[in-house]
């Protein structure tokens, strides 16, 4: 029984239309694990947004582009820069390569390409001091556009509009045409300010998280309950044979480390309260107490022990009625790091109303549910 990602297609599409109305010329980002949806599903969703003006998608790597070519008929712009000397992946001409160094531009000259500009993110890109050399590397040709990838969080005095503007001025002063500038993490007023300042340049916002995951009411992750067993206080359980702290129930659910359950990326802590909470969580983990992402009856519960490869063991107190095998627990997971067994789409047909099954209903599934394996 699977770890399932439910998608209300009707609500999801309505959110897409709202985002597109607010951010014209948007370029959807389709990369990584597909934000939990899978890459083909996102590419197909972007294709359906064509009438709203979506004529490009931004794809993480050349390998990812090869996977989604059959699902999106227009241009694919790579986010990963070409590395001279790396293995070359043959792709059709509608895939636009990315260059982040003068050497890469020199090797890609004559091909369709966009060029990364080094921003305050300090991650990759050509520097302003290299622009004359860059012009020579283009050998009389032109890039289809330039990219300025901006930080999500900025110091109080940071001005992203000025940062992008400085790059447009610098490129033009070097004799380079800037027909398109790809940007990220800018608001609509900031985009409008750039458009007024540079009417001959088209500013295109690359967006992934806000577009695909921005309406949490349209999506929900759920883990299938595989088994429920009573446990007495002090009874040994699990691979590591730790003792149960209290009597109650051990609930075995789908979803383990292979799915991304229990895996956590480092976080930036700002302020006293977030740091204090993190210290508290660290103290609990040192005592082998870790809160799981799984909820039952509106409450998250503790891992009985660290998640296994494909399942997790959760402890429920004996005072609470447990779920039944075949039911589901809501899972609060990081979508960009989770690989679901199944993506279940409902409200696919607008003439067929549907809703999520009640939590814990054994075997219940939404009507008009279309399943997609995460391996597709």
Language-model segments: which ranges?
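Active-site-proximal beta-alpha core segment in soluble small-molecule metabolic enzymes
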Residues: 3-14, 24-177
């Amino acid at each position: 029984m699977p770890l399932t990602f439910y998608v209300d297609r009707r609500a999801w599409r309505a959110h897409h239309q709202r985002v597109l109305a607010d951010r014209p010329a948007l370029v959807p980002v389709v990369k990584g694990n597909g934000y939990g949806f899978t890459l083909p599903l996102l590419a197909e969703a972007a294709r359906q947004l064509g009438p709203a003006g979506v004529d490009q998608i931004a794809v993480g790597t050349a390998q990812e582009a090869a996977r989604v070519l059959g699902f999106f008929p227009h241009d694919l712009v790579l986010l990963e820069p070409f590395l001279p000397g790396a293995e070359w992946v043959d792709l059709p001409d509608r895939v636009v390569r990315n260059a982040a160094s003068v050497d890469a531009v020199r090797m890609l000259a004559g091909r369709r390409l966009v060029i990364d500009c080094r921003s305050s993110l300090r991650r990759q890109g050509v520097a302003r001091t290299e622009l004359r050399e860059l012009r020579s590397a283009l050998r009389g040709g032109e890039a289809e556009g330039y990219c300025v990838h901006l930080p999500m969080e900025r110091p109080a005095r940071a001005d992203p509009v000025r940062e992008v503007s400085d790059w447009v001025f610098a490129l033009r002063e070097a004799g380079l045409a800037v027909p398109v500038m790809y940007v990220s993490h800018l608001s609509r007023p900031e985009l409008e300010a750039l458009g007024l300042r540079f009417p001959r340049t088209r500013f295109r916002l690359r967006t992934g998280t806000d577009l695909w995951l921005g309406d949490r009411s349209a999506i929900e992750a759920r883990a299938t309950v595989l088994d429920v067993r009573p446990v007495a206080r002090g009874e040994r359980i699990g691979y590591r044979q730790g003792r149960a702290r209290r009597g109650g129930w051990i609930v075995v659910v789908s979803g383990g480390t292979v799915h991304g359950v229990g895996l956590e990326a480092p976080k930036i802590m700002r302020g006293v309260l977030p740091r204090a909470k993190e210290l508290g969580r660290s103290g609990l983990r040192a005592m082998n107490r870790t809160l799981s992402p799984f909820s039952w009856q509106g409450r998250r519960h503790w891992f009985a022990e660290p998640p296994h490869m494909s399942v997790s063991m959760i402890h429920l107190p004996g005072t609470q009625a447990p779920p039944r095998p075949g039911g589901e627990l809501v899972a609060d997971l990081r979508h960009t790091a989770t690989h679901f067994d199944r993506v279940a789409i409902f409200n696919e047909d607008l003439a067929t109303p549907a809703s999520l099954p009640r939590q814990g209903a054994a075997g219940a599934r939404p009507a008009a549910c279309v399943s997609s394996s995460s391996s597709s």
